[in-house]
Regions:
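PRPP-associated nucleotide enzymes
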Residues: 1-330
Length: 330
């Protein structure tokens, strides 16, 4: 069931949740829609397509169907990224395991350019699902393979990373490792290309660190540049911050960046407050751990998503009954 909002209701949502629609369409030959977000020191784009909207709005999309749509989206994204001029040098592609392969950008990019694939798996020293706040949660590397850098030409290189970027802490750690390994081999990273579900706060955090190294950023966010909930994990398009409400009973409205036209489409399908990527790795068919493929945890993701949606529904029904009536039954 898709409920449609009137123009006045769309404007009210944009205003109430602080949704940033100050974006400009980039004219491309590629199939994907590309929008540039204004007012950033770095190049920040939104990549949108029917596949992107399905992945963002349907947490029940998992397994082979999820992989198929993700691959189709990546096949549209690569021409857009290249046409936007984001890649000019030899390409180092860093996979942050285990979710990386599920974005499938490398599968399409490798058909267009030679890439040197590096691998790293990180983990928090304490369980981190829906909780990236605790200062004692440090990140460590449990697997690394940078051997492909031995074949990469010395000099300037572009670094491509596909991942879910929430707080940016995991990415920060992974970037530090590969930049260090590249420098040992006479390789200088000039440009960082990011692709995936990306939060604005996490991206700003990465930029504030990476610009000190003189590295440029071209970020390509799937569907929208998201806000980040108070747990530094959930990445909705818009809605109340569910984690803050559950913890402290406080209603805080948050919204991301998206084109006005795209928001009209998404508003009819999206559950306000829903974490768009979910536990992205758990939505995939198989997970590569650096040595072999292992089963994902699809049932765990589905149960968590169901419970999450139930909490959102109860919150909206109590605090925002008019919005609940528009979005219930999805």
């Amino acid at each position: 069931m898709v409920n449609r909002f009137s123009d006045s209701e769309i404007e009210a949502l944009i205003s109430e949740f602080g949704i940033n629609t100050d974006v400009e369409r980039v004219s491309l030959k590629a199939d994907a829609e590309l929008y540039r977000i204004k007012g950033k020191e770095y190049c920040c784009f939104i990549i949108d397509s029917p596949e992107a909207m399905q992945i963002a709005c349907r947490p029940s999309l998992v397994g082979d169907e999820m992989e198929k749509l993700s691959g189709a989206l990546a096949a549209k994204a690569v021409p857009a990224i290249l046409e936007a001029g984001a890649i000019k040098n030899p390409i180092i592609f860093e996979h942050i395991l285990r979710a990386s392969l599920g974005y499938h950008l490398h599968d399409s990019l490798i058909n267009e350019r030679k890439i040197f694939q590096a691998w790293i798996r990180t983990q928090y020293t304490y369980p981190s699902y829906k909780d990236h706040n605790e200062p004692e949660k440090t990140i460590v590397s449990t697997f690394e393979d940078f051997s492909a850098l031995d074949s990469c030409p010395q000099g300037a290189a572009d670094l491509v990373v596909q991942d879910t970027i929430a707080s940016g802490k995991t990415l920060e750690f992974s970037l530090g490792r590969i930049i260090s390994e590249a420098e040992k081999r006479g390789i200088v990273i000039w440009n960082l290309v990011l692709y995936g579900f990306i939060s604005e706060r996490g991206l700003d955090y990465i930029w504030n660190g990476i610009k000190k190294r003189g590295i440029e950023i071209h970020a390509f966010a799937i569907s929208n540049l998201t806000p980040l909930c108070s747990n530094n994990y959930d990445m909705p398009l818009y809605g109340p911050d569910e984690s803050l409400y559950s913890e402290k009973g406080i209603i805080k409205n948050i919204g991301g960046a998206i084109s006005r036209q795209a928001f009209e489409r998404y508003a009819g399908l999206f559950i306000p407050g829903l974490d768009q990527p979910g536990d992205f790795s758990a939505r995939l068919s198989k997970l590569y751990n650096g040595k072999y493929f292992e089963d994902s945890e699809i049932p765990v993701h589905l149960k968590r998503s169901y419970d999450y949606i139930e909490r959102i529904a109860k919150m909206l029904k109590k605090e925002r009954p008019s919005l609940y009536s528009k979005t219930s039954g999805r």
